[in-house]
């Protein structure tokens, strides 16, 4: 699989308490199937952070990768925006 075909997501770091692992919350807008209202749906991904670069509330870009552990299938590409 080429790197260009891998999924990428942008989200906010919710937790960085684990060593070399961050939890990223990704928000998507979904239309309700019956009522049509647009809702925010949040999904949490565990991502590999090799250098422990990301902090809580940072906006980050993550990319899909091979399974690194039981729950980690994503890795940190870059910190898009630092928390204030």
Swiss-Prot record:
**Which one Pfam family would you cite for this protein?**
Ribosomal_S17
Return one Gene Ontology term, BP aspect.
translation
In terms of CDD domains, this protein maps to: Ribosomal_uS17
**What GO molecular functions are on record for this protein?**
rRNA binding; structural constituent of ribosome
Q: Which residues form a coiled coil?
A: none
GO CC terms: ribonucleoprotein complex; ribosome
Q: Which UniProt key words apply to this protein?
A: Ribonucleoprotein, Ribosomal protein, RNA-binding, rRNA-binding
**Matches recorded under InterPro entries:** NA-bd_OB-fold, Ribosomal_uS17, Ribosomal_uS17_bact/chlr
Q: Which family does it belong to?
A: Belongs to the universal ribosomal protein uS17 family.
Subunit details for this protein? Part of the 30S ribosomal subunit.
Name the NCBIfam families for this protein.
Answer: PRK05610.1, uS17_bact
Functional note: One of the primary rRNA binding proteins, it binds specifically to the 5'-end of 16S ribosomal RNA.
Q: What is this protein called?
A: Small ribosomal subunit protein uS17
């Amino acid at each position: 699989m080429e790197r260009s075909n891998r999924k990428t997501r942008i989200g906010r770091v919710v937790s960085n308490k684990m060593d070399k692992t961050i939890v990223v919350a990704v928000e998507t807008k979904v239309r309700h199937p019956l009522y049509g209202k647009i809702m925010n749906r949040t999904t949490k991904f565990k991502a590999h952070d090799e250098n422990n670069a990301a902090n809580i509330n940072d906006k980050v870009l993550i990319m899909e990768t091979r399974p690194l552990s039981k729950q980690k299938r994503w890795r940190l590409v870059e910190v898009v925006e630092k928390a204030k």
